[in-house]
Swiss-Prot record:
One of its GO terms (molecular function) is iron ion binding. Zn(2+) binds at H68, H70, H238, D313. 4-imidazolone-5-propanoate binds at R77, Y140, H173, Q241, T318. This is Imidazolonepropionase. It comes from Psychromonas ingrahamii (strain DSM 17664 / CCUG 51855 / 37). Keywords: Cytoplasm, Histidine metabolism, Hydrolase, Iron, Metal-binding, Zinc. The gene is hutI. InterPro entries: Amidohydro-rel (IPR006680), HutI (IPR005920), Metal-dep_hydrolase_composite (IPR011059), Metal_Hydrolase (IPR032466). NCBIfam families: hutI. Pathway: Amino-acid degradation; L-histidine degradation into L-glutamate; N-formimidoyl-L-glutamate from L-histidine: step 3/3. Binds 1 zinc or iron ion per subunit. Catalyzes the hydrolytic cleavage of the carbon-nitrogen bond in imidazolone-5-propanoate to yield N-formimidoyl-L-glutamate. It is the third step in the universal histidine degradation pathway. It comes from the Bacteria. N-formimidoyl-L-glutamate binds at Y140, N315, G317.
């Protein structure tokens, strides 16, 4: 829990557009898992207790945060990948009973042990890319016991892996077959049964919903959000991925921490995000994997100074990409972000998307000592190089991890 880092080039990462702010030849003194002191080496204290690590002037950043994943599931959807490549759209696959429902069926049948083993395999890719905090959604159960099963596995991941986990209930991911003729009854079930049970079991931090033509409408979305808020939970939304439904504006006005995807977000929606402090989480992996062409309104987000986060959206159907460094590159090459914006997108802005902006995502005194040491000369290399093992070490709560 106590660790003295010396001879570091610190990339503090600020929430404002201030540049990289690299502090060369600095130390960080970590006490009880928190950053207690930062300064130049000339004023470096002696290591009175705990370990000492010479960073050898390598770059030190905040630990990365993947703020949108569907990490816990069974099976795969490689066959649908083949279908899409022959021209069958994702929406059509979903309407035919494929898509999310394919994964739901497999996940319902799987044991917690099976789900945990598979999730830890997926997580290993994120850990190699410097992820120290990960959000994990449910949404592949769509019934009470299966949704809780997924959330329990997410909690077990935090206990078994060196990582902080934020859990999100996404029971309103799709309408299960048993409710296919009455989606409103399913929303009743989500609001009156699943959300209260998840709260009682202390398994959930946020509630999410897929607000889209093939998902849930605005009225249903509002009902789910109201239920979540009544239990003191945070809210977030899958919005404006395939069409402009107004879900982002609704979520923002109701206090959402983030809205995610956003390819079809318009200026009205962007303004709502800005007015309510909601983070725009972009998911270039899904955009790439689905071969979409509608770009999210990055320039409008910049104009209105909306914080932009980036995440893998790791899932079996639309983004089986367990690399946050790859996502940073995609954010730059596909969406036109700068490498600096991409770095903020997986640190301070991702922390804000999870309600952790005062704890993680920056290198500041009083913050959790979640850090990454990289074998690079400049921060832009993080978004530039693909497939290179850039990470030297992760530090979580002041503990040096040997991943």
């Amino acid at each position: 829990m106590n660790l003295l880092l010396t001879n570091a080039s610190i990339v503090t990462v600020e929430t404002n557009d201030t540049g990289y702010l690299i502090k060369h030849n600095h130390f960080i003194n970590i006490i009880n898992g928190k950053i207690a002191q930062i300064g130049g080496m000339a004023s470096c204290p002696l290591a009175s207790s705990g370990k000492q690590l010479d960073c050898e002037h390598k770059l030190l950043t905040p630990g990365f945060i993947d703020c949108h994943t569907h990490l816990v599931f069974a099976g795969n959807r490689a066959n649908e990948f083949e279908q899409r490549l022959t021209g069958v759209p994702y929406q059509e696959i979903a309407r035919q009973g494929g898509g999310i429902m394919t994964t739901v069926n497999a996940t319902r049948k799987a044991t917690e042990a099976q789900l945990l083993e598979k999730a830890l395999q997926h997580l290993s890719g994120l850990i190699k890319d410097g992820v120290t905090t990960v959000e994990i959604k449910s949404g592949y159960g769509l019934d009470l016991e299966s949704e809780l099963k997924i959330l329990r596995v997410a909690k077990q991941i935090e206990q078994q892996a060196n990582i902080k986990v934020s859990t999100t209930l996404l029971a309103a991911h799709a309408v299960p077959l048993e409710f296919k003729d009455n989606p409103d009854r399913y929303i009743d079930y989500v609001c009156n049964t699943i959300i209260p049970a998840a709260v009682k079991a202390q398994l959930v931090d946020y509630v999410d919903i897929f607000c889209e033509g093939i998902g849930f409408n605005l009225k249903q979305t509002e009902r789910v959000f109201k239920s979540a808020l009544s239990f003191g939970l945070g809210i977030k939304g899958h919005t404006e991925q395939l069409s402009n439904s107004g879900g982002s504006a609704l979520a923002a006005k109701m206090g959402a921490s983030s809205v995610d995807h956003l390819e079809y977000l318009d200026e009205t929606g962007v303004k709502a995000l800005a007015d309510n402090g909601t983070v725009a989480t972009l998911l270039p992996g899904a955009f790439y994997f689905l071969r979409e062409t509608q770009l999210p309104p990055v320039e409008l987000l910049r104009t209105y100074k909306v914080p932009i986060a980036l995440a893998t959206d790791f899932n079996p159907g639309t983004s089986p990409i367990a690399s946050l460094l790859m996502i940073m590159n995609m954010g730059c090459t596909l969406f036109g972000l700068t490498p600096e914006e991409a770095l903020r997108g997986v640190t301070c802005h991702a922390a804000k998307a999870l309600g952790l902006a005062q704890q993680r995502g920056q290198i500041k005194v009083g913050f959790e000592a979640d850090l990454c040491l990289w074998n690079i000369q400049h921060p832009a290399q993080l978004a530039y190089e693909i497939g290179t093992n850039l990470l030297i070490s992760r530090i979580i709560n002041g503990v040096l991890c040997n991943d």
